[in-house]
Swiss-Prot record:
Class in the EC hierarchy, top level: transferase
Reactions catalysed, as given in the entry: RNA(n) + a ribonucleoside 5'-triphosphate = RNA(n+1) + diphosphate
A single GO BP: DNA-templated transcription
Full protein name: DNA-directed RNA polymerase subunit beta
Quaternary assembly: The RNAP catalytic core consists of 2 alpha, 1 beta, 1 beta' and 1 omega subunit. When a sigma factor is associated with the core the holoenzyme is formed, which can initiate transcription.
One GO CC annotation: DNA-directed RNA polymerase complex
Superkingdom to which the source organism belongs: Bacteria
Organism field: Geobacter sulfurreducens (strain ATCC 51573 / DSM 12127 / PCA)
Alphabetized GO MF terms: DNA binding; DNA-directed RNA polymerase activity; ribonucleoside binding
Free-text function comment from the UniProt entry: DNA-dependent RNA polymerase catalyzes the transcription of DNA into RNA using the four ribonucleoside triphosphates as substrates.
Length: 1370
């Protein structure tokens, strides 16, 4: 075949200017890898890493009892095979999960009471069933109770330390107050903050604040130790002739000289008094050997002692540490003959006295008091003891069970504070606390930077695995409490591990997480793109995240670090804007949960082919060139200065300073945005709408891939998992609508494999959004397929490419007001050709229960119904497949026993004569709800185990079994044929060592004769092992090995299929009280109609306002009518010019197709067609491909291109205006793409030329059929007796205050009275009205509206005694 699927991608002309560097990573890897890391299902237990589930078990176990005489230890866990496969879970409404068993060891100790020595008494090991754990399907989803769900990844604040300030808002003076916060992964938060007096406070868990030194003292530091940690000291020398200080170059740099500094030998003045110590002056002093500097007494006064100053003779403390040096104290020091002492270096410029002031404000001296003070703050009301205070403090930050920074938190702490603590130390250390405080003080003193919490280095992603890991930990901790209690209540030595463990709490937590967590969502299955996008979504909401109300503008905003990591375009409109984002195309998530994006490495101005992934923190400070920077053939930058990004700024950087380069222009946008051609020409707001609306496109009956795409269509279709991809290379053996059989190439499969792939296609299944999932084969028998090729298209895919809409010819012009305000005028031809027809499948369920009054029964024998109503039901009471149904029709007949009523004597007599029948049951059949009209396409019946099966169930089972048997026979046939082929290769032509006879005793192969194919065919395969070959070693062994393998493979296949058949015939697990459940599926064909919403890919949306006959549409000179007319005013103010460029390029693509069609119709020579195609494509790759085709193949390609030549205009490197003009020229059109149009009604030409082209238009999920609704008589509200509202409740139309005014203005008094009484809540009036109509009288007698009674009761409840007095008018 000339255009196999593989070659089809060549047929899309690509305008990309940049060669592809790396492939886009698999789009749903974010889900799959995370869950794989969590379960480690393919890793042998002993090789498992300490992460995911393994880490959870290791962190909770061992569990010891209170007396420490027994411990329950964890060994390993294993996962079994799931009970049902994915398909069965869908059908039966089950959860796709694997049973988990955990091997635990119970160790019992003997403790010697005198010595306290422990010895092991007993060890018991056992595997304990630990509930089920949901498994992820191939496509990254979970099946919970039969529905597909997705766990959305959460973007939350990373653990670590964060510095911030209040921007001067807290205190009236406008002073900036700095604060630090240590956030662990789990555990207590620690906050440090300054107040307006520069005193440092600490809060634990946002409780009341206390001086920070209380915490530091509780850590065991004395006041002296703290002062010497946070401040440098100056040494003061005292003598009779004056005072000096030691010259410390580090401290001098910020000081002034108080007296002239003179060189001792030369007498030269090195620095005059009151001059700053410059670097040069300090250098000179060092050269002249000056180690001490003369100072005045004033300089020393007001300084603070850095340690106790002691009288050397008596040991008496003259000045205590942290005391101020006053004149009296200085005189005392001199008098006692002390020659040197140290003072704190505080200059109030670079070093402030805040920590010293805090120590003064803090009235607590010793560690013990500090611990008790902290205990009082955290547990007010509890009497503190030193032991309990110590235990509490220890548990707060230093106990790994209570406090966990996680590897990420430790990494961030080390990174910010420059520490070297190993990553596996995941609690706080004393040094951490000191360094956090030191950095905060430095920050206040003007060193260091505050953190930006919206930087992606400070936000990380928690994907499925991690979210589930946290839930599992919660469950295990709950279980741990129960186990400890059991261990202390019972004699442990008599127990086995399974007596202690009850896994219910764990299963319950997991079930709750998947069932009702905010991050576990019903998968958006409208089309393949919406599936992929849903799995790649990042949400800042959810448990442990933000809430909509609290999130400000900064969090929602686009941040420079989002580049290449999070899409700046795709986010919902409305209250969630910015809180829910999408991963960019090339982004991935590293093991720490940070989002990474790939860059090419640049060395010495030359771009290498190395690609490396960088997180937002690693990228800081690097200069990064754009992907479209000009380069020569060697990969050097052409321009000397290149536009680049560096630390969030856009700069011009010299080419030698560049370190990295983007890998692709579309690196910064998400999958949905990368599907919009000419995105660069659209306004961002409209691009946002465009990327969101593509997710709402309904799969159409006839998928049609876009003529103007971006080249991403194939990637999305393949990674979404809706199309069927070949698992191995091989040859297609057989194809029908529901399955494809591929015989695998011999070099592909191992000896154990069966050598056959059977792909069962999904036919007309219902998606979560009620759209239709259907797969169609795109290969023929005999085709050779490669591993990874698409062999069957799914919904919204066309030849392996995503196809969400249709290519239609559009004209931009007003037409009779029908395209006012974004309305769309559509040609009837689109409806007639089923271009926008979609199929929707509704599921209806009928349950027969065991009630108190007796069993409900599903049957066709329903009382008081005529033949007509039952004509489509079979004898089991279930509607036949293929029946056309409309609202009110019976789908499943069901009768329910009625409560016994008092019977009259006559009835009793009749019952006695005719037996109990019609009287005691009522009809509760499942009927078609209003607004549904379609064809029944399937029915499934689930019945209790052990219940009798009805004829319909048996028929369904037979059909399913036949299908399975056919698969089994095909597999056996193919592997048998393949084995026979191998054997014949070995045997034919060789000479036989023994003679072989057939059943009748006739010799088929004589001894010594050459073995022929005919002879082999005459012997049944199971007797081929009797054949022996002479003269060649090893052949007999090979033959018997092949036959043995064949037999084993056949046995395996039979075993697997028998198991499937057994499952079919087994009863179903139904909820308690349910006897039988029937599900009926109805397919509804929805044609395009007025009121349906349609949209382009550029945010240009509208509603169909009129469907015009084809002959009335504006037409071109050659008589071709346009298919859609859009309003030209929809473009300028919205600034989405991309739609015009798309229209122009689409017009060229269509025109080229028409030219090829003309050539084919006029039988142009093949070379002429080939030349034209080469001219259009203009790539050497395509030239080679076209040259490799023979004439027939070339004609096939040309036929495929008649509908138009598909183009790819990738995002940010799309077709230029020149290229579009040249394409229009090749199509033989005017460069402006404007055409003279004629009015379809009058035949007159329109005054001006009109822009006409081909646009890709989608039909969205907002269909008028789902919204339109009318009520006759329906349910009423209980209290007010007014009709309910809304389609779901079969409600009425609200008539509000303004509508009443309108009726009053018209003077329509009686109509209004009717609206407000009998048509609404006048209960008696409603009945009278009904009676009047039945009797044929047409009089209106309105009574009291029920809402009046409600009002009176309301007033009475306010103790106002209001009553209605009734009387005659006179």
């Amino acid at each position: 075949m000339a255009y196999s699927i593989a070659n089809n991608q060549l047929l899309r002309k690509n305008f990309a200017k940049i060669k592809k560097i790396i492939d886009i990573p698999n789009l749903i890897d974010i889900q799959k890898n995370s869950y794989k890391r969590f379960l480690q299902i393919d890793t042998p237990p002993e090789a498992r890493k300490n992460s995911g589930l393994e880490a959870v078990f290791k962190s909770v176990f061992p569990i010891k009892d209170f007396s420490d005489t027994a411990s329950l230890e964890y060994v390993t866990y294993t996962l079994g095979a799931p009970k049902y496969d994915v398909e069965e879970c869908h059908q039966r409404g089950m959860t796709f999960a694997a049973p988990m068993k955990v091997k635990v060891r119970l160790v019992v100790w003997d403790v010697n009471k005198d010595t306290g020595v422990r010895s092991i008494r007993d060890i018991k090991e056992q595997e304990v069933y630990f509930g089920e754990i949901p498994l992820m399907t191939e496509n990254g989803t979970f099946i919970i109770n039969g529905t597909e769900r997705v766990i959305v990844s959460q973007l939350h604040r990373s653990p670590g330390v964060f510095y911030d300030h209040d921007k001067g808002k807290t205190h009236s003076s406008g002073k900036v107050l700095y604060s630090a916060r240590v956030i662990p992964y789990r555990g207590s938060w620690l906050d440090f903050e300054f107040d307006h007096k520069d005193i440092l406070f600490v809060r634990i868990d946002r409780r009341r604040k206390m001086p920070a030194t209380v915490l530091l003292k509780a850590l065991g530091y004395s006041a002296e130790a703290l002062l010497n940690y946070f401040y440098k000291s100056e040494e003061i020398l005292v003598a009779a002739e004056g005072m000096w200080k030691k010259a410390d170059p580090e401290l001098l740099a910020s000081q002034k000289a108080s007296v002239d500094i003179v060189a001792p030998k030369t007498g030269e003045v090195l620095l005059k008094a009151n001059r700053k110590f410059t670097k040069a002056a300090i250098r000179k002093m060092t050269e002249h050997g000056i180690t001490q500097i003369p100072i005045t007494m004033e300089e020393v006064l007001g300084k603070y002692a850095s340690n106790d100053i002691v009288d050397p003779s008596t040991g008496e403390v003259i000045v205590e540490c942290n005391d101020e040096i006053t004149q009296a104290r200085l005189d005392d020091i001199k008098a006692k003959g002390i020659t040197e002492f140290k003072v704190l270096f505080i200059d109030n410029l670079h070093v402030t006295s805040s920590l010293r002031d805090t120590l003064i404000a803090d009235k607590i001296a010793a560690t013990e008091e500090a611990l008790i003070e902290i205990y009082r703050r955290l547990r007010p009301g509890d009497p503190p003891t030193l032991k309990s205070a110590q235990a509490l403090f220890e548990n707060l930050f230093f106990n790994a069970e209570r406090y966990d920074l996680s590897a990420v938190g430790r990494l961030k702490l080390n990174f910010k504070l420059g520490l070297n603590v190993p990553l596996d130390c995941q609690t706080l250390t004393k040094d951490d606390v000191l360094e956090v405080v030191r950095y905060l003080i430095d920050l206040k003193n003007g060193k260091g930077t505050i953190d930006d919490i919206d930087h992606l280095g400070n936000r990380r992603v928690r994907a499925v695995g991690e979210l589930l890991e946290n839930q599992y930990r919660i469950g295990l901790v709950r279980m741990e409490r129960a186990i400890k209690e059991r261990m202390s209540l019972q004699e442990v030595e008599n127990l086995m591990p399974h007596d202690l463990i009850n896994s219910k709490p764990v299963s319950a937590v997991v079930k709750e997480f998947f069932g009702s967590s905010q991050l576990s969502q019903f998968m958006d299955q409208t089309n393949p793109l919406s599936e992929v996008t849903h799995k790649r979504r990042l949400s800042a909401l959810g448990p442990g995240g933000l809430t909509r109300e609290r999130a400000g503008f900064e969090v929602r905003d686009v941040h420079p670090t989002h580049y290449g990591r999070v899409c700046p375009i795709e986010t919902p409109e409305g209250p969630n804007i910015g809180l829910i984002a999408s991963l960019s195309t090339y982004a991935r998530i590293n093991e720490h949960g940070f989002v990474e994006t790939p860059y090419r490495i640049v060395q010495d101005g030359k771009v290498t082919s190395d690609v490396k992934f960088f997180s937002a923190l690693e990228e800081e400070g690097h200069a990064i060139a754009q992907a479209n920077a000009e380069m020569d053939a060697d990969g050097r930058f052409v321009n000397e200065y290149v536009s680049a990004r560096k630390s969030g700024e856009f700069l011009l950087v010299h080419r030698d300073e560049l370190e990295l380069m983007d890998v692709a222009p579309m690196q910064l946008v998400s999958v949905a945005a990368s599907l919009i051609p000419f995105l660069e020409n659209d306004d961002a707001n409209r691009a946002l709408m465009g990327s969101n609306m593509q997710r709402q496109a309904v799969p159409l009956l006839k998928a049609d891939s876009p003529l103007v795409g971006t080249g991403m269509e194939r990637v999305v279709a393949k990674d979404s998992g809706v199309s069927v991809v070949a698992r191995h290379t091989g040859i297609v053996e057989s194809v029908d609508a529901s399955r494809i059989v591929v015989k695998i190439d011999e070099d592909e499969f191992d000896e154990t494999g069966t050598g056959v792939d059977i792909y069962n296609l999904i036919k007309f299944a219902r998606s979560n959004q009620n759209t239709c999932i259907n797969q169609r084969p795109v290969v023929k028998v005999g085709d050779h397929v490669k591993r990874g090729d698409v062999i069957a298209d799914g919904p919204s895919t066309d030849m392996g490419e995503l196809a969400l809409g249709q290519n239609v010819v559009v004209a931009f012009m007003p037409w009779g007001g029908y395209n006012f305000e974004d309305s769309i005028l559509v040609s009837e031809k689109l409806v007639k050709d089923d271009r926008y027809t979609s199929i929707h499948i509704e599921e209806f369920e009928c349950v027969a229960r065991d009630t108190k009054l007796g069993k409900e029964e599903i049957t066709s024998d329903i009382p008081n119904l005529g033949e007509e109503a039952l004509k489509d039901l079979d004898e089991s009471g279930i509607i036949r497949i293929g029946a056309e149904v409309k609202p009110g029709d019976i789908l499943v007949g069901k009768i329910t026993p009625k409560g016994e009523t008092q019977l009259s004597p006559e009835e009793k007599l009749l019952r006695a004569i005719f037996g109990e029948k019609a009287g005691d049951v009522r009809d509760t059949s499942l009927r078609v709800p209003p607004g549904v009209e379609g064809t029944v396409i399937g029915a499934k019946i689930f019945s209790r185990k052990g219940a009798d099966k009805d004829s319909r169930t048996e028929m369904i089972e037979r059909m399913e079994e036949d299908k399975l048997r056919k698969d089994e026979q095909d597999e056996i046939r193919i592997i048998r044929n393949s084995a026979v082929g191998k054997l014949k290769k070995l045997l034919v032509g060789k000479s036989a060592a023994v003679k072989v006879e057939d059943k009748s005793g006739r010799t088929v192969i004589a001894k010594g004769a050459a073995i022929t194919e005919e002879a082999l065919d005459a012997i049944p395969l199971d007797r081929w092992d009797e054949i022996s070959v002479s003269g060649e070693a090893g052949v007999d062994e090979k033959v018997s090995a092949i036959l043995q393998t064949l037999q084993q493979q056949i046995d395996i296949i039979r075993y697997v299929f028998d198991d499937k058949v057994q499952k079919l015939k087994r009863g179903d697990d139904l909820p308690p009280g349910v006897i039988k459940m029937v599900k009926v599926y109805i397919a509804i064909k929805r044609k395009l109609q007025v009121g349906d919403k349609m949209a382009g890919r550029h945010g240009n949306k509208g509603v169909v306002s009129r469907i015009l006959p084809e002959e009335d549409m504006p037409y071109m000179e050659d008589g071709r009518p346009v298919e859609i007319v859009l309003n030209p005013l929809g473009v300028p103010s919205r600034m989405n010019v991309g739609q015009i460029l798309e229209t122009h390029l689409g017009w060229a693509a269509k025109g080229i197709g028409w030219k090829i069609e003309e050539m084919l119709e006029s039988y142009s020579p093949a070379d002429h067609i080939k030349g034209y195609l080469k001219d259009v494509y203009g790539t050497t790759e395509m030239d080679t491909f076209l040259d490799s085709l023979d004439k027939d193949e070339l004609m096939n390609v040309a036929k495929r291109l008649q509908r138009g030549v598909a183009m790819a205009s990738p995002v940010f490197e799309g077709a230029s205006e020149e290229q579009i003009r040249s394409m229009l020229d090749k199509a033989g059109f005017d460069e402006t793409a404007q055409v003279s149009l004629y009015d379809g009604k009058s035949g007159e030409p329109f005054k001006h030329k009109v822009t006409v082209g081909v646009m890709y238009v989608l039909k969205l999920h907002h269909l008028v059929d789902d919204k339109i609704h009318a009520r006759s008589i329906g349910p009423y509200s209980l209290v007010t007796q007014q009709p309910l509202g809304g389609k779901a409740q079969f409600g009425g139309q609200r008539l509000g205050e303004m509508e009443v005014w309108a009726m009053e203005a018209y003077g329509a008094a009686y109509a209004l009275q009717e609206f407000l009484t009998v048509k609404s809540d006048d209960v008696a009036g409603r009945t009278r009205m009904y009676e009047a109509i039945v009797k044929g009288k047409h009089t209106l007698e309105p009574g009291l509206p029920e809402s009046f009674n409600v009002l009176i009761k309301e007033l009475q409840s306010l103790c106002l005694d209001v009553e209605l007095l009734e009387g005659d008018e006179d």
